[in-house]
Amino acid sequence: MFLIITRDTMFFTAMKNILSKGNVVHIQNEEEIDVMLHQNAFVIIDTLMNNVFHSNFLTQIERLKPVHVIIFSPFNIKRCLGKVPVTFVPRTIAIIDFVALINGSYCSVPEADVSLSRKQHQVLSCIANQMTTEDILEKLKISLKTFYCHKHNIMMILNLKRINELVRHQHINYLV
């Protein structure tokens, strides 16, 4: 069984055509996940305009104990699903490489553009969603010094001189 988590109907249709060999289920919100029915599924997540990280959605996915998770994202987030095997791929992956990845064959999957820790991605997502510093500190339960440390490291990784340049960053749509 394949669970396709996306808000993009064109993406889902393409995945359904590629994965025609199996049972393909379209998931748009966390209420549609059935922990018993979808147990041990193969999960494919599209994060374009659908940032499911750091939400109950990801907790639900972890409970499914999926066989493998493929995430379409320019971000490689270290240990985002604990011990669940995760592969990050860009949306520009060749169909032949994607099919090889699904079948468990070796393929040269391009590396993600940006590699972040879970906490860095969480801070970045909060900043991209225009949360105030105080709200971020309260939500993430971190100190101001830790926040500025993460913010500085994120700016270095993304090559930003000022944090307001994030609004024009090429990957901003993967954070909201």
From Swiss-Prot:
One of its GO terms (biological process) is regulation of DNA-templated transcription. Pfam families: GerE. Disulfide bonds: none annotated. CDD domains: LuxR_C_like. Residues 109-174 form the HTH luxR-type domain. One of its GO terms (molecular function) is DNA binding. InterPro entries: Sig_transdc_resp-reg_C-effctor, Tscrpt_reg_LuxR_C, WH-like_DNA-bd_sf. Residues 133-152 bind DNA. Keywords: DNA-binding, Transcription, Transcription regulation. Induction: By acidic conditions. Could be induced by EvgA via the induction of YdeO. May act as a transcriptional regulator of dctA. This is HTH-type transcriptional regulator DctR. The gene is dctR.
